[in-house]
Design a protein with these regions (language model features):
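Terminal substrate-recognition subdomain of acyl/acetyltransferases
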Residues: 2-3, 154, 159-180
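Conserved G/P- and acidic residue-centered "switch" motifs that form tight phosphate/ATP-binding loops
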Residues: 72, 104, 134, 160
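Conserved acetyl-CoA-binding loop-helix of GNAT-fold acetyltransferases
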Residues: 102-116, 135-143
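Conserved GNAT acetyl-CoA-binding A-motif
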Residues: 119-129
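Conserved catalytic-core motifs of GNAT/GCN5-like acyltransferases
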Residues: 127-130, 147-163
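Conserved active-site tyrosine of GNAT-family acetyltransferases
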Residues: 141, 146, 168
Length: 180
């Protein structure tokens, strides 16, 4: 799954490589990141290596990194999962380095990948899940055109309370209607 060009004006976007693993592990293990994920377990180097081998050889999952063009700093990781070429849909997600949040990078990465998935890969539907407490992400997803499709009520225990897991989806026709 080759990407068009190599990113955006501010970001180099490419497949995750072994040289990225330590920074990506630190991002995953950061408390602010874990609060937003469905999986709350810290990852060791050994666990990450096994995971990397699996995702590197997968036909249905990919991981990409976004790095700032000016200094090669890691901005975030974009997840593509459950890629179903027969039904033309996939699940996506992103983790942004805490110091890089609220600077428009998540929107930039999502817009880049949505263009790619709908225009180049011919996907019909892109979906994601997020926690109700992740209000910034929910606002971004709605801004991008994602629609809430359902909830798993009180499915996730975070920060001392149960909260819903929100399923959102975006269809190609909805994306094209927004972007022309």
């Amino acid at each position: 799954m080759a990407l068009p060009a190599n990113g955006t004006e501010r970001l180099v976007i490419r497949l995750l490589e072994r040289r990225d693993l330590e920074e990506v592990r630190c991002l995953h293990n950061h408390d602010e990141t874990l609060l937003r994920l469905t999986d709350v377990w810290h990852v060791s180097e050994t666990q990450q290596e096994a995971w990397f081998q699996g995702v590197s050889s997968s036909h249905t999952s990919r991981r990409y990194v976004g790095r700032r063009r000016t200094d090669d700093a890691l901005v975030g990781v974009f997840r593509l999962d459950r890629l179903d070429s027969w039904n033309r849909n996939a699940y996506v997600g992103a983790d942004v380095v805490p110091a890089m949040r609220r600077q428009g990078y998540a929107e930039e990465m999502f817009a880049y990948f949505l263009r790619y998935l709908f225009n180049e890969c011919g996907l019909h539907r892109v979906a994601l899940v997020t926690l109700t407490s992740n209000t910034a992400a929910l606002a971004l997803y709605r801004k991008l055109g994602f629609v809430e499709e359902g909830r798993e009520r009180q499915a996730i225990f975070r920060d001392g309370r149960f909260q819903d897991l929100v399923l959102m989806g975006l269809l190609a026709e909805e994306w094209h209607g927004r972007t022309g």
